[in-house]
Regions:
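Peptidyl-prolyl cis-trans isomerase
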Residues: 171-220, 250, 254-257
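Short, well-structured beta-strand/strand-turn elements
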Residues: 56-61, 124-127, 199-202
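Second-shell loop/turn segments in exported
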Residues: 23-37, 46-56, 71, 95-100, ...
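Surface-exposed intrinsically disordered loops and tails
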Residues: 10-11, 15-20, 213-219, 226
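Short amphipathic alpha-helical segments that mediate assembly, nucleic-acid/protein binding
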Residues: 83-86, 130, 169, 184
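N-terminal targeting/tethering segments
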Residues: 1-95
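Surface-exposed patches in mature extracellular/periplasmic domains of secreted proteins
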Residues: 52-62, 183-194, 234-237
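PPIase-associated folding chaperone regions across multiple families
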Residues: 85-164, 216-280
Length: 280
């Protein structure tokens, strides 16, 4: 089924391209077959793990599957279509009723297996496991106070306005350097809350945890963070975003990680997802 699905998509989009050969000498048809094989293995591993961990469908899950079946019937053979007509439609696409049920059941079980292994938010991942994941992928955590050099529409400020922003940044840096080192972290947090113009502060109030050196942040910011030790504060760092004063932090399992989603997740959860993906 998976092979047919891929083949149907490719031929509809690009015509008969299955014999096209990649640079390593493998035809597109062979690549599609390998992808299909991978999906088959993945689905059966999930099924085995569900059985091994006693993960079963709930009544709510079954209700979701029943709704999915009805929706698929209506979208495939019409609002007045029957299950029999729907299964005839599937048969033309190399799908048996058993395969249809199996695939949909696995889709519903997938997140339940994750929760059984790691907890809903990765809480079963230990601190040591989360920090080992951070070390393996070079995660770093940093806060910054940003003075933007563009307006809300993205238009660059004038040279005079930029100079004023830099002077403001210098005044804040001087204030930080004027207090004993033991007091700087607390003062940094106060000044970040009062002075920073970073729109991401509301989502990441305790700093950004990200994969250092991977292009997640602008290079000037990233280079500055990687040059600091935890607890150290940078000088004024200029980037396309503006002027930054950066403080590197110790990485903790509860740091919010930048995963390219609108929803922030903890490092602990990110470690769980990475481990889960490596298995499945």
């Amino acid at each position: 089924y998976f092979y047919w699905l891929y083949m149907d998509y490719v031929t509809n989009a690009y015509g008969n391209a299955l014999d096209v050969t990649s640079s390593n000498g493998v035809t597109l048809g062979r690549l599609l077959a390998l992808d299909a094989e991978g999906y088959c293995i993945q689905y059966h591993v999930i099924d085995q793990q569900a059985e091994a961990n006693n993960v079963t469908l709930t009544e709510d899950d079954q209700a979701v599957l029943d709704e999915q079946l009805q929706s698929d019937i209506e979208s495939s053979v019409g609002e007045d279509g029957t299950e029999e007509e729907f299964y005839e439609y599937l048969a033309e696409r190399f799908v048996t009723p058993e395969l249809y049920d199996f695939v949909n059941r696995i889709v519903v079980l997938y997140p339940r297996i994750f929760m059984s292994l790691y907890g809903e938010n990765g809480e079963n991942v230990t601190d040591g496991e989360a920090l080992a994941f951070a070390e393996e992928y070079n995660f770093v955590t940093a806060k910054h106070i940003l003075f933007r050099t563009s307006d809300n529409s993205g238009e660059a400020l004038s040279d005079e306005e930029k100079a004023a922003k830099r002077s403001e940044a210098q005044a804040v840096l001087d204030e930080l350097n004027a207090v004993p080192e033991a007091e700087r972290a607390a003062l940094f947090d106060e000044l970040m809350k009062d002075k920073s113009e970073d729109p991401g502060l509301t989502v990441y109030p305790n700093g950004y945890c990200y994969e250092g050196g991977a292009g997640v942040m602008v290079s000037e910011f990233d280079d500055a963070v990687l040059s600091l030790q935890p607890g150290e504060i940078s000088g004024i760092v200029e980037s396309s975003s503006g002027y930054h004063i950066i403080m590197r932090e110790e990485v903790t399992p509860e740091d919010y990680v930048m995963l390219g989603t609108s929803q922030p997740y903890t490092l602990r959860y990110a470690a769980a997802v990475a481990d889960f993906d490596s298995v499945f």
